[in-house]
Amino acid sequence: MDRERYDKVIEACSLSKDLEILSFGDQTVIGERGINLSGGQKQRIHIARALYQDADIYLFDDPFSAVDAHTGSHLFKEALRGLLCSKSVIYVTHQVEFLPSADLTLVMKDGRISQAGKYNDILISGTDFRELIGAHQESLAVVGSADASSVSENSALDEENGVVRDDIGFDGKQESQDLKNDKLDSGEPQRQFVQEEERAKGSVALDVYWKYITLAYGGALVPFILLGQILFQLLQIGSNYWMAWATPISEDVQAPVKLSTLMVVYVALAFGSSLCILVRATLLVTAGYKTATELFHKMHHCIFRSPMSFKIAKTCSKTCIYSS
């Protein structure tokens, strides 16, 4: 692993504090759905994985949609304009405040490229694009004024209740610090939800085969299956021996039995072997179907009665693989 690039990517994607919060840092298993992560954290992790690949061409499809404005500005500055300054980046976005930094701007309308060129050139030549930029700036101004008014109201309340807020803040910090110290002093290792599977190596034990054999009807069909197989083999050997003994070697040698007797006995042996193989196959299919049904029902019963920790630790993909 390139540790230097790894640290740069973590810093550019604002993941340092997130890794500190996680119990096992960057070794925390988050599962197939990104458990314990918010939408913004997932998005920044995806961006970090792409940045670490150190490719020549990057394609971003509105990557800052799940993050706030401040984080989006940081990602654009540190990631796209920082780490990827020497790369070819195709950036698709609705956030027009990032367009002045682009080398080439393509304006899409109804699925087609309506304008192409530098940001300032398009802004001067295109009325639609100018209206879009103006509407975006007006919306930013409205949001900024609303934020400023809320901040002023909060500051006024802080001045009126400053002592009370300071006391509450001090107590809250002290309590959180005490809880943190208690967790550190307890010394109990935290457990990950998704754990690595344990696999047994070696040959399959005999009791496993015995449980499988006796699962269908308590193993009552097994003797009949073996008997059918044994009778089939005996009849096959008998029919071959009968044909070798009853068939004359040449025309000069007299046959030990009549031709009709030879055919009747051979047909009887063939019919008996066919009947045995039919019975064996029927019993084998019945036992196999019953065993598979019992295993499936037991598996469903265990899954439905399992605690929530099992459903978190075992992902849906693994459960489906085991079920198949």
UniProtKB/Swiss-Prot annotation:
Residue ranges of every copy of the ABC transporter domain listed in the record: 2-111
Keywords (A to Z) from UniProt: ATP-binding, Membrane, Nucleotide-binding, Transmembrane, Transmembrane helix, Transport
Membrane topology (UniProt): Multi-pass membrane protein
GO (cellular component) term, any one: membrane
InterPro entries xref list: ABC1_TM_dom (IPR011527), ABC1_TM_sf (IPR036640), ABC_transporter-like_ATP-bd (IPR003439), ABC_transporter_C-like (IPR050173), P-loop_NTPase (IPR027417)
Main location: membrane
Compartments, record wording: Membrane
Family to which this protein belongs: Belongs to the ABC transporter superfamily.
The name this protein goes by in its record: Probable non-intrinsic ABC protein 5
Lineage: Eukaryota, Viridiplantae, Streptophyta, Embryophyta, Tracheophyta
Gene: NAP5
